[in-house]
From Swiss-Prot:
Protein name listed in UniProt: Large ribosomal subunit protein uL29
Cited Pfam families: Ribosomal_L29
A GO CC annotation given for this chain: cytosolic large ribosomal subunit
Ribonucleoprotein among keywords: yes
Top-level taxon in the UniProt lineage: Bacteria
CDD domains tied to this protein: Ribosomal_L29_HIP
Organism whose genome encodes this protein: Mycoplasmopsis synoviae (strain 53) (Mycoplasma synoviae)
InterPro entries: Ribosomal_protein_uL29, Ribosomal_uL29, Ribosomal_uL29_sf
Keyword annotations: Ribonucleoprotein, Ribosomal protein
GO molecular function: structural constituent of ribosome
Family designation: Belongs to the universal ribosomal protein uL29 family.
GO biological process: translation
Coiled coil: none
Length: 65
């Protein structure tokens, strides 16, 4: 996910995106711990996507203040 795509979303969409990504990360980490996850490279990608979304969210919140 590119930062441009994330930055274009509204605050509500960013909150939903962060929650969805965190839920997906939890699922992948659980599957990884049980040994059933084959694509382990997705975990760091999701962490970076969450960081991008949180950064964009913080920027939007700072703009409105």
């Amino acid at each position: 996910m590119q930062f441009k795509e994330v930055k274009a979303k509204s605050v509500e969409e960013l909150h939903k995106l962060v929650n969805d990504l965190k839920a997906e990360l939890w699922t992948l980490e659980f599957r990884n711990s049980t040994g059933s996850l084959e694509q382990t490279h997705k975990i760091p990608q999701l962490r970076k996507d969450i960081a991008r979304a949180l950064t964009a969210l913080k920027q939007k919140e700072m703009e409105t203040k």
